């Protein structure tokens, strides 16, 4: 019997490409994580709009990135390096089946950058304007950043700046290329669209607008953390390598370092944020801990193979510790209503973590590398600010960036999409009632539970249990048990002064940290 002859290179390539496919699917699973995280941090009347934007980010984004984005990245890489470029070659992946796995891996990163923006502009941006920006960030803004870095452009070792300094920009899995790009773009969008109604008082003081579900926000955070292993560990794309003797070598040490630093950064960020929020508010806040966990991950995303394990722990802790101060600076000083705190979580943490890589590098400190890191962070941020401002301004000119005041008050679910994620809060459709019409709240009208028909249990009069105050059971009408103060079950609890608070903790917030 002739022994089976196997080419080690073929085996290694096959295993590595299967690995890339698997982690690409894992990174895709971050999309529902983003959807849940953002949905939990907005009010119930805007959840459908959040879900629509997140689905659009992916569905439209992959089409644009396939037709345009990936090619733009290659062209920018050639334009900003001595190598030059060929337009036809830049788009050759479209017809090359051998390049499609690599394209998919790049696409899931591009979609992440786009999705981050949604959380900053939630609850007031016109959907058409958002679609324009989503298409542009995946087709042009992010691909330019990719071209400057990962596609061999300006900041890479072979790019003009990298060659001049003798070192290339270090960002392993996209702390700045993906996350800071998305976070800065979100900040620009939030500034240009303006704050939500009621977000700031007459004298400019912060007025928290709590989201409707801490549960969804934390669940989304944990799903994102799970997908992040694909993001970071998956970027270590070589699982098997060939040796000089023709054998195969498992790259366990490299994979292990990335996995360990990712995990330590995640944990350190969460604990640091818990400590800071406790010091700031007097009690540990679950949402701030969730934000710190994500910020810790962002902070180490660019650093995971380059720093020591303890360096990763420190970077993660820094990322988590600065989330609350960065958010408060954004809201209190800049007066920007960043609903989900994406600039603090993705922008600031990504910039700090990537800039400090040389300080904790495995090979020791390098001043030249530090210069490159700081320059790279600045260049990426500057490009993102300018490009995003132009696109948002253009979209605003054509469509208007913001929905009407009436639509914002009613909720974007009804105004933009004609749906409600929680129909029991607002009544059902029926022959005499349009979809989304609120159930009556005028002290004697009908309680409806059957799509529009009247349900009465006392011969026609309203059910009363408190000597005259109305008790309603349709998930959105007023329940009165105290002689006058309204208790609502549609996400807001209203006290004597009409200010919405959260149950059990009137300073807690679930909208990215909007605490007094």
Swiss-Prot record:
Biased composition (Basic and acidic residues): 445-491
Domain of life: Archaea
Swiss-Prot/TrEMBL GO biological process terms: ammonium homeostasis
Alphabetic keyword roster: Ammonia transport, Cell membrane, Membrane, Transmembrane, Transmembrane helix, Transport
Topology in the lipid bilayer: Multi-pass membrane protein
Keyword Transmembrane helix on entry: yes
UniProt region (Disordered), positions on chain: 426-516
Site (Twin-His motif. Important for optimum substrate conductance): 179, 346
Compartments (UniProt record): Cell membrane
Membrane-spanning parts: 17-37, 59-79, 101-121, 130-150, 170-190, 214-234, 258-278, 286-306, 307-327, 342-362, 374-394
A GO molecular function held by the record: ammonium channel activity
GO CC annotation, single: plasma membrane
Disulfide bond sites: none
InterPro entries: Ammonium/urea_transptr, NH4_transpt_AmtB-like_dom
Factors inducing expression: Highly expressed during ammonium starvation under nitrate-rich conditions.
Role summary: Involved in the uptake of ammonium/ammonia (NH(4)(+)/NH(3)). Transport is electrogenic.
Subunit structure comment from the entry: Homotrimer. Interacts with both GlnK1 and GlnK2 after ammonium shock. Interaction is rapid, reversible and dependent on nitrogen source.
Family (UniProt): Belongs to the ammonia transporter channel (TC 1.A.11.2) family.
Protein name: Ammonium transporter Amt1
Provenance organism: Haloferax mediterranei (strain ATCC 33500 / DSM 1411 / JCM 8866 / NBRC 14739 / NCIMB 2177 / R-4) (Halobacterium mediterranei)
Gene: amt1
